[in-house]
Swiss-Prot record:
InterPro entries: 4Fe4S_Fe-S-bd, 4Fe4S_Fe_S_CS, NADH-UbQ_OxRdtase_51kDa_CS, Nuo51_FMN-bd, Nuo51_FMN-bd_sf, Nuop51_4Fe4S-bd, Nuop51_4Fe4S-bd_sf, Thioredoxin-like_sf. It is found in: Cytoplasm. The keyword Repeat applies. The gene is hydB. The lineage of its organism: Bacteria, Thermotogati, Thermotogota, Thermotogae, Thermotogales. This is Bifurcating [FeFe] hydrogenase beta subunit. It catalyses: 2 H2 + 2 oxidized [2Fe-2S]-[ferredoxin] + NAD(+) = 2 reduced [2Fe-2S]-[ferredoxin] + NADH + 3 H(+).
Amino acid sequence: MFKNAKEFVQYANKLKTLREKKLNGVSIYVCVGTGCTAKGALKVYSAFEEELKKRNLLGQVTLEKIDDDKVTLNRTGCCGRCSSGPLVKIMPYRFFYSNVAPEDVPEIVDRTVLKGEPIERLFLTDPLTGEKVPRIEDTTLFKNQDFYIMEAIGESECDSIEDYIARSGYESLVKALTSMTPEEIIETVKASGLRGRGGGGFPTGLKWEFTRKAQGDIKFVVCNGDEGDPGAFMNRTLLERDPHLVLEGMIIAGYAVGAQKGYAYIRAEYPFAVKMFKKAIEDARKLGLLGENILGTGFSFDLEVKEGAGAFVCGEETALLASIEGKRGMPRPKPPFPAQSGLWGKPTLINNVETYANIPRILRDGVENYRKRGTENSPGTKMFSVAGPLKATGIIEVEFGTTLRDIIYNICGGFVEGEEFKAVQIGGPSGACLSEDFIDMPLDYDTLKKADAMVGSGGIVVITKKTCMVEVARFFLDFTKRESCGKCVPCREGTMQAYNILEKFTHGKATYEDLKTLEHLSKTIKTASLCGLGKTAPNPILSTLKLFREEYIAHIEGECPSGMCTAFKKYVINPDICKGCGLCARSCPQNAITGERGKPYTIDQEKCVKCGLCASKCPFKAIELV
């Protein structure tokens, strides 16, 4: 435990030297983020451990002691290229291997670890050029990004406080506690122009200032890690790969606003993120960076993790606070805002995971360094999770002002064969769908707001021409109606009724009157709902009505332009292929298929519910959806 800042600085300098020595030796880094783990990364890690032990090559894994002539095996966090995992990086050669299987491990040890030879078949494929590239930093995927908070890709240890300190970790905390007043810290954050990364984009420095000036002897700091958007996993990635970065930001925030206690509210569905953050808290306490009298400065601050039960509405700050208090997660009207009356009625600062992660580097590298990225009103970078039929998907970090075209084509490599661009859904289930007209629009808070869209937490779903936009709206509204807390009528009842109307569209039963009702109802929900969930729930409907209205009209006229909605199609049996085996008839739950054995069967369209079971059972592929 460090008694003062001087002891910490001496320790940090020692660790920096040791880490440099380690990276110059042979080190293996296996990505154990959730994406790679789902594809077998832990088995790959175990295979390396077993192989190195068998050859007596496994060295000490901490920076405190590095065994010469040995190989260090490390767990690293998400590298961003989740679609190519499991990922492995070999230092000092910087070879970056993708889709690694346990069976590849002996060859990697033989050729790369012992001889320094590359294995070309394991190289990462550049999504833009299609070429095999030995090092991730040489790919267009990497070059077209700006890793401001996602530093040290593939060569940091997600479970080591020593590694974080060796990467200049906690230096900003030392600087804040020993040479800055709380007011100076807040002014620095205000000058940086940092805006909340949780979706609203409220100026972070102003929020800190409000909390600092709020009356009260007891104050709290809360981290909103309740990332509930389908397909969004930026917060999870940060908490898994660099938990101390978020923790350091929270401690600095506690000092700046005058708080004594903090809570990290993390989804229970993120078990690895919860585990990493709890370990980070424990390790920081052991070194005296958290708890009583931090670094002998007289400042005391402690943290604990509160696991969320999974309700999407708990991403709303007042619902989140209610959940921490042990109550049902339900939003309340504002004002008073949490900065005035939050946890147990005390002034409370709430920021997103990514917001806190920016703080240490802003204090360490300065405001000018931060503001050279992004745009005037949206400085800095933003992490996005990109999903869809692209050549590369996963987590990216880009400057604000980057266009959708850059993300889709210059970073993710464009579409897989047979797919064409149609739209982008940005901002999660509460976000908007944007057409191709917006593909060159800079992504920042103000520009997206003008387009009736939002950054949200950073989820980007790329949609192709094979997808029905009415179905997209129905899908997202199905999610938000289920996640409504039920407190206010516009959200509880309105989303249900809007969903029922969308069901009529996708089932071929909608009328022009339904179209009129849907639009009016959506605007009413947006205006009259109590909290952000209800106010933004109709966004997918309103944006698709605005930009893809012709698809709604086509559904009324009896056609789904994308061919996705099966209600506008029918299953038919091709008499030239059908052998008359009767297997389809026996599998039909509606008894809609009849015929004489040995002759072609037919389907009664009045009885058919288009379940597709008959087509899946037919061994001759005689049943088609037309």
